[in-house]
Amino acid sequence: MTAKKNYLISFVILLIICGSIKNSFATHISQPVLIDPKTHFTVGDTVVLSGWVEYNAQPAPDVLLNFKLIRSDGSLVANQSYPSNQKGHFEFKFDTKNELPGSYQFTVTSHCLEIHRYACTYKNQTLSIQLSNP
């Protein structure tokens, strides 16, 4: 009788462990969505790119985002991180008055909520920007 009891308890514990492992491999998928991004600017303009963080087809507040702006030669112009606001929206601003004309690559990456960081997929959106002389 004791052996049957031990087997039953072991089987229940095994089921609990297997159920926990399945959930531990779930990923948190949030992604940045740019809203009507402008791609052409003039030297001296302020680049303003806005959007929202989508999670389960809803805006997600307090999701850490990383914003990178890179010149065509690969040099880094801007590297900033901050969370989406309470409505799940974000805005990136960059002053171009000291920049050279040319192509730039803007990338915004979702780093997920702090509590989901262990299972984050780090989705991003990339946009090519042209900066021209006035």
Where are these regions (language model features)?
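Short beta-strand elements
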Residues: 114-134
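Enriched for extracellular/lumenal, surface-exposed ectodomains of secreted and cell-surface proteins
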Residues: 100-121
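Short, compositionally biased P/S/T/A/G/V-rich stretches that sit at domain boundaries
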Residues: 23-47, 132-134
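Glycine-centered loop-to-beta-strand initiation motif
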Residues: 83-94
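Short, surface-exposed loop/turn segments at beta-strand-coil junctions that are enriched for proline
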Residues: 56, 93-101
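A short beta-turn/strand-edge loop motif at beta-sheet boundaries
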Residues: 41, 55-62
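Short edge beta-strand/loop segments characteristic of extracellular beta-sandwich folds
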Residues: 48-56
